[in-house]
Amino acid sequence: MLFRSALLSNVLLLPACAHDVLFSRDLPLPIAANAESYTDCANAAWPPSNVGVELVPQPPDDELRAMVDEMSAENIEATITKLVSFGTRHTLSTFNSSTRGINAARDWIASEMRKYAAESNGTMTVEVQSYVQGVASRIPFPVTISNVLAKATGSEDPSRVYVMTGHYDSRVTDVLNYESDAPGANDDASGTAIAMELARVLAKHQPKSTIILGAVSGEEQGLYGSTYLAQTLKNTSTNVEGMLNCDIVGSSTGDRGQKDPFTIRAFAQGPPPLSAESSAKAAQRLQIGGENDSPARELARFSAEVAANNATGMKVAIIYRLDRFLRGGDHTGFLQAGYPAIRYTEPNENFAHQHQDIRTENGTVYGDLIEFVDFDFTARVGKVNLATLWSLAQAPAMPRNVTIDATILDNESRIKWIISNSTDVASYEVVWRSTIASLWTHMLDVGKVGYVVLPLSKDNVIFGIRAVGKNGYKSPAVYPFPG
């Protein structure tokens, strides 16, 4: 069916500039610009047209709001306190103690996860996924690396999977020092505590699609546990449509005392790695200006849209990078496996409290100590993860085979995709933005069709297509390639 949006000229809403946005989703303050000029306004679809309406972020429904309210800062504090009590959780630490070391922590996490799963009426299962890592970088002797995974099986589309992880291993200054205490309260007991709290909440609320909540190991030695998890999922052809990595999400205070307790950064890679995208497609992406519309960045935009609101009390600041300088994270292995993945990290880091021997020098306390963790902030980050995961799982799957016609030299845009046979899909939306805008700014519901012709030049805007469920939830947008 052909849908011509020009017929909807009565739905004109002019685009908003910086002073009109509903809430801020970027970390830096906006740079002053001429608000009267559509060419300078990042939130404008230039040139102005009478197509579509201004995009309004997806609000949480009553069920999601109630779930978000279940996230407990007290539970997160108790979990971090317990993880710190194991002394060190270094990947190479003692294996034969029930009170100290990585295995003691693993067993406790698994025990707690199983308690949560017992409340799920069989919809949540817990697995300890282990393998023996031979001698390798930062691994001087063979060691068992274990991931604790709680899987909430989807009620309607269980083959579609979303993953969230935090890593439970820790370290001090010397990455091979597995004897000294390494509390790892922020890095990354905070992310592990969020994964566990999400498991507790989701055990009582079955999602439509499957959600895996993981406490992974071997991160500090080289992302071993998460890479193994990603490759295992890839080797079994698991359809992972999104992965969230929570790492260093426990403090709102930076090393200069600056505080930003209501913002979380979301790191999102640009062009996918060559292991996930062919060289031909990578070249095409650059040719058509799609370097800012990788699956990872669409996932980050989705998180900013559904999780930055008054239910979570947070803003999501998208950072257009794989990760911070000189650092890496557990989302990397998922990206290399071809899965969309992003990393959440606190807005202002204090490096005296990361990867440090516990000590005091010149009045400065070093070490990843629990006294530096903001439990309310960590709980709010958990709410961002919950809102994102639940909104992903309740929405229809992303549209498939989305293409734009690049064979005709004109000022219309022809986009097509495969219509889903799912009864949950109510319609599709075209979203778009200026090429200099970070987030989608405009949308047009085109019904349950698989082809649309828009009186907007593909040269001037960036398009995406997303599926809309009968329940109101919307999928992440898919960027169209020529086809």
Curated annotation (Swiss-Prot):
Write down any Gene Ontology CC term: extracellular region
**Entry cofactors:** Zn(2+)
| The Fibronectin type-III domain, residue ranges | 396-483
Q: Molecular function (GO) terms listed?
A: metal ion binding; metalloexopeptidase activity
What are the protein's UniProt keywords?
A: Glycoprotein, Hydrolase, Metal-binding, Metalloprotease, Protease, Secreted, Signal, Zinc
- The answer to whether the entry has keyword Secreted is yes
- InterPro entries in the record, alphabetically? M28_fam, Peptidase_M28
- Extract the Pfam families matched here: Peptidase_M28
Protein's name in the database: Probable zinc metalloprotease PTRG_04977
Read off the lineage from the record. Answer: Eukaryota, Fungi, Dikarya, Ascomycota, Pezizomycotina
